[in-house]
Amino acid sequence: MNNTEFHELVDEKLQLLEDMIDDSGADIEPVITGNVLTLEFENRSQIVINKQEPMHEIWLASKSGGFHFSYVDEKWTCSKTGMEFIEMVKEECQKHADEEIEWV
């Protein structure tokens, strides 16, 4: 994969994530600054999602720690847990929000 393809794939996934957050009605504020998407919660906690172009990875930092996702078999998979990116973000959002989030 080249850098252009990497950015297209990540941007598509991050847009999906933003749409899911909007549709959930959860009090999560997505803020994009450069290659970083920060999910800000009412309790002031954050999840930071970062595009790592040199490694063609997505990095996620949350209360649970740091996680790296590589594009394998047409999905972003965590090297530490084997979880798919969106599933892990949903799980981490629930931990940060301290409440059940109804994902659509």
Swiss-Prot record:
On the tree of life, the source organism's domain of life is Bacteria
Gene Ontology CC: cytosol
**Which InterPro entries did the record assign?**
CyaY (IPR047584), Frataxin/CyaY (IPR002908), Frataxin/CyaY_sf (IPR036524), Frataxin_CS (IPR020895)
Under the GO molecular function aspect, what terms does this record hold?
A: ferric iron binding; ferrous iron binding
Instruction: Report if keyword Glycosyltransferase is assigned.
Output: no
Q: Which UniProt keywords apply?
A: Iron, Metal-binding
Q: Which GO terms describe its biological process?
A: iron-sulfur cluster assembly
By sequence similarity, the record places it as follows: Belongs to the frataxin family.
Q: What does this protein do?
A: Involved in iron-sulfur (Fe-S) cluster assembly. May act as a regulator of Fe-S biogenesis.
Protein name per UniProt: Iron-sulfur cluster assembly protein CyaY
Taxonomic lineage of the native organism: Bacteria, Pseudomonadati, Pseudomonadota, Gammaproteobacteria, Vibrionales
